[in-house]
C-alpha cells in the first residue's frame, strides 16, 4: 500500500523523479532573482530620482528663497527710494515755502525800501544821486496800497502848530529917552520882548576855538589842486609877503580839500598868520583867482582875544601881484556876516531886511554852486559905516521862521555901538521895516498857501514822479478846506529858468481853509524835508508870478 501511495505521489508530481524537481526549481528562481534585482535597481533608481528631485526641489526652494530675498531687497530699496523721494519732495516743498516766505518778506522789504527811497529822494538834497535810482523808484507799481503811506507827509502835525516866529521888537515905551511922536504901543502886531542883543555871553577858550581862528577858507580852486600843491603855494606866498610872523618855517600846518566843491580849509600855525592870509583874497592859484575867507564857524569874539583879526598893514602884497585894499570887495572891518537865514528867503527879501538900516555898498547871498539854492547866510557892507553896529545889534538873535539870525562883524570881535548911533529914530525905523518884512514873507492871510523847499527839480522832471507828488499834495491839502487848485512849477526841458521850481502852491476857496492848511502843514516833513508854509499874494498867484 505504501508503495502504491508513493507511486501515486510520483504521478501527482508529474511522474518526474525528485532530482528533476530541484533542478527545475533552481531554474525558475534565477529569473525571479533577476527580476527582484531589477526591481531593487528600479527602487534604487526611483530613490535616486526622488533624492535628485528632492535636491532639485531644495535648489528651487533655495532659488525661490533667494528670489524672495532679492525681491524683499528690491522692495526695501524701493521703499528707501520712495522715502527718499518723499523726503526730497517734502524738503523741496518746505524750501519753496521758505523761499516764498522769503520772497514775500523781500517783497515787503522792497516795498518798504521803495517807500523809504521815495522819502529819501526828497530828503537827500545833495543832487549827486544817480538817475538810475530814480528810474528804480519810478518803476514801482502805481497800484500799491495807500494804507501803507497815505501821502508823502511822514509825520502828523504837532499838537501846537509850528508857525513862523518873527522878532519880538520893543515898543517905544521901552526905548531910552522920550517917546516918539506918532508912534503908539499897539502899532505892531508882534509881541513885546527885551531888546538887549549886545550882551555877549563869555565862553571858555578852547583849543577847538583856537584852531578855528587859525583856519582860512579858500574857494574856487582849479580841479588840479591837491593838498600838497595848496600847502606849498601858501607857504611860498606867505613868506613872499612877509606874513610869517610866528618865526621861521612853514606857515601852513594842514590842508583839507573838498574836490567836489573845489574849496579847501588851510590851517595856519598862528592866529596872526591866519589874519595875514586874509589879505590874499583874489590871488591867482594855477591861473585861477581864489577866494580867501574866514570859515563860517569863525568866532570873532573869541578870536579877538587870541591875536590880530586884521591883516598886518606892513604886508608886501605887491610882491605877489596884489594891490593893498583891493582884495575881496566885501572885505574889511565893516563887513557883516548874516547867518541863520531861512533857506526859502530870496535875495530880494534878505536885501529888504538889511536895507531897512540903510543902502548897501555890497551884498552877497551865498548859494550852492550846483543847485543855486541859498545856503542860509550872506555878507554885506553898508554905504554908511556908522550903521554897521546898529544893524548887528538889532538883527542878531531874532527869530525868522524856524531860524535864529546870527549877525556880526565878519572880521573882528563885536564892537559896542557908539552912543550917537543909538538914536531912537533909527530903532523906530527898524520896527517899521521889520513889520513890512513880516508881511512880505507871508504873515498876512490869503487864500493861497505856498510850501517851499518841498521837492527838487530832478523829481519834477519825471512825469510819474510829478503825478505822485501832485496826488500826495491833493490828498493832504484837501483835508483842511475846499481846495480849488494845486500848482507845482516844473523845470523847462530846454533848461530855461522857471520861476517857483521847488515850491507848491495851494489855492483854497476861502481864507479859513488856507489858514488851517498853513497851520497844519508848517513844520511837518514831506519826504523827510521840513515844510515851510507861508501865505502867498493872491494877485501874484493869479498872474502866475511864482517868484515873489
UniProtKB/Swiss-Prot annotation:
GO terms for biological process: spliceosomal complex assembly. Residues 1-156 are annotated as: Disordered. InterPro entries: Nucleotide-bd_a/b_plait_sf (IPR012677), RBD_domain_sf (IPR035979), RRM_dom (IPR000504), RRM_dom_euk (IPR003954), U2AF_lg (IPR006529). Residues 1-82, 94-120 have a biased composition (Basic and acidic residues). Residues 83-93, 121-149 have a biased composition (Basic residues). The keyword Lipid metabolism does not apply. GO terms for molecular function: poly-pyrimidine tract binding; pre-mRNA 3'-splice site binding. Residues 214-297, 334-412, 453-539 form the RRM domain. SMART domains: RRM, RRM_1. Necessary for the splicing of pre-mRNA. N-terminal RS domain has a very strong bias in favor of D over S. Belongs to the splicing factor SR family. This is Splicing factor U2af large subunit B. It comes from Oryza sativa subsp. japonica. The gene is U2AF65B.
Amino acid at each position: 500500500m505504501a508503495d502504491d501511495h508513493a507511486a501515486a505521489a510520483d504521478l501527482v508530481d508529474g511522474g518526474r523523479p525528485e532530482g528533476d524537481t530541484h533542478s527545475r526549481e533552481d531554474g525558475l528562481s534565477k529569473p525571479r532573482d533577476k527580476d527582484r534585482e531589477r526591481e531593487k535597481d528600479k527602487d534604487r533608481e526611483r530613490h535616486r530620482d526622488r533624492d535628485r528631485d528632492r535636491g532639485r526641489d531644495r535648489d528651487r526652494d533655495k532659488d525661490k528663497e533667494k528670489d524672495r530675498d532679492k525681491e524683499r531687497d528690491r522692495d526695501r530699496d524701493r521703499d528707501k527710494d520712495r522715502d527718499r523721494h518723499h523726503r526730497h519732495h517734502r524738503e523741496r516743498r518746505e524750501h519753496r515755502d521758505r523761499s516764498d516766505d522769503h520772497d514775500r518778506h523781500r517783497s515787503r522789504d522792497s516795498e518798504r525800501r521803495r517807500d523809504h527811497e521815495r522819502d529819501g529822494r526828497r530828503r537827500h538834497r545833495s543832487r549827486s544821486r544817480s538817475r538810475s535810482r530814480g528810474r528804480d523808484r519810478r518803476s514801482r507799481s502805481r497800484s500799491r496800497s495807500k494804507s501803507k503811506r497815505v501821502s508823502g507827509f511822514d509825520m502828523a502835525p504837532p499838537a501846537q502848530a509850528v508857525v513862523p516866529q518873527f522878532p519880538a521888537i520893543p515898543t517905544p515905551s521901552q526905548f531910552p529917552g522920550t517917546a516918539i511922536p506918532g508912534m503908539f504901543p499897539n502899532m505892531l502886531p508882534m509881541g513885546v520882548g527885551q531888546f538887549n542883543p549886545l550882551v555877549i555871553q563869555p565862553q571858555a577858550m578852547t583849543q577847538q576855538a583856537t584852531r578855528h581862528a587859525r583856519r582860512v577858507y579858500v574857494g574856487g580852486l582849479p580841479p588840479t589842486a591837491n593838498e600838497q600843491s595848496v600847502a606849498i603855494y601858501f607857504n611860498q606866498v606867505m613868506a613872499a609877503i612877509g606874513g610869517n610872523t610866528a618865526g621861521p618855517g612853514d606857515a601852513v600846518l594842514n590842508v583839507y580839500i573838498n574836490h567836489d566843491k573845489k574849496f579847501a580849509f588851510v590851517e595856519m600855525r598862528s592866529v596872526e598868520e591866519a589874519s595875514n592870509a586874509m589879505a590874499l583874497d583874489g590871488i591867482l592859484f594855477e591861473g585861477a583867482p581864489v577866494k580867501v575867507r574866514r570859515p563860517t564857524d569863525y568866532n570873532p569874539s573869541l578870536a579877538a582875544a587870541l591875536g590880530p583879526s586884521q591883516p598886518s598893514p606892513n604886508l608886501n602884497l605887491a610882491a605877489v601881484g596884489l594891490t593893498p585894499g583891493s582884495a575881496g570887495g566885501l572885505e574889511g572891518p565893516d563887513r557883516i556876516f548874516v547867518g541863520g537865514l531861512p533857506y526859502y528867503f530870496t535875495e530880494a527879501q534878505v536885501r529888504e531886511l538889511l536895507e531897512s538900516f540903510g543902502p548897501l555898498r555890497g551884498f552877497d547871498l551865498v548859494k550852492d554852486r550846483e543847485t543855486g539854492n541859498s545856503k542860509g547866510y550872506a555878507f554885506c557892507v553898508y554905504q554908511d559905516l556908522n550903521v554897521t553896529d546898529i544893524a548887528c545889534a538889532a538883527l542878531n538873535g531874532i527869530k525868522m521862521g524856524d531860524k535864529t539870525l546870527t549877525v556880526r562883524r565878519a572880521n573882528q570881535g563885536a564892537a559896542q555901538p557908539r552912543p550917537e548911533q543909538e538914536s531912537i529914530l533909527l530903532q523906530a525905523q527898524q520896527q517899521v521895516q521889520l513889520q513890512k518884512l513880516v508881511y512880505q514873507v507871508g504873515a498876512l492871510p490869503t487864500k493861497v498857501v505856498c510850501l517851499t523847499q518841498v521837492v527838487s527839480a530832478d523829481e519834477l522832471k519825471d512825469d510819474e514822479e510829478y503825478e505822485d507828488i501832485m496826488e500826495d499834495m491833493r490828498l493832504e491839502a484837501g483835508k483842511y478846506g475846499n481846495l480849488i487848485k494845486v500848482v507845482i512849477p516844473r523845470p523847462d526841458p530846454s533848461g530855461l529858468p522857471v520861476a517857483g521850481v521847488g515850491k507848491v502852491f495851494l489855492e483854497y476857496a476861502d481864507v479859513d481853509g488856507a489858514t488851517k492848511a498853513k497851520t497844519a502843514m508848517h513844520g511837518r516833513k514831506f519826504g523827510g524835508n521840513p515844510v515851510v508854509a507861508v501865505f502867498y499874494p493872491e494877485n501874484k498867484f493869479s498872474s502866475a508870478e511864482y517868484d515873489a
